[in-house]
């Protein structure tokens, strides 16, 4: 199911907020493995490049870490 987005703000920024809220709420627990970029993008109804940008921002903020062969994990 696609999410609804506010057209006045960048979609990637809204994704960052939503993913951050899920991390802080425990939906994605520390050490938990995140779904693939494609799966997360499909669930949100966005382009994978947009989701990649959101995940890169979360990584820059220290909330997510990327393991080259294993994917992304919540820190």
Listing of model-derived features with the role each one plays in the protein:
Residues 36, 70-75:
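Minor-groove-contacting beta-hairpin "wing" of winged helix-turn-helix DNA-binding domains
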Residues 33-66:
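N-terminal helix-turn-helix
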Residues 1-34, 39-43:
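Extreme N-terminal segment that seeds HTH/winged-HTH DNA-binding domains in transcriptional regulators
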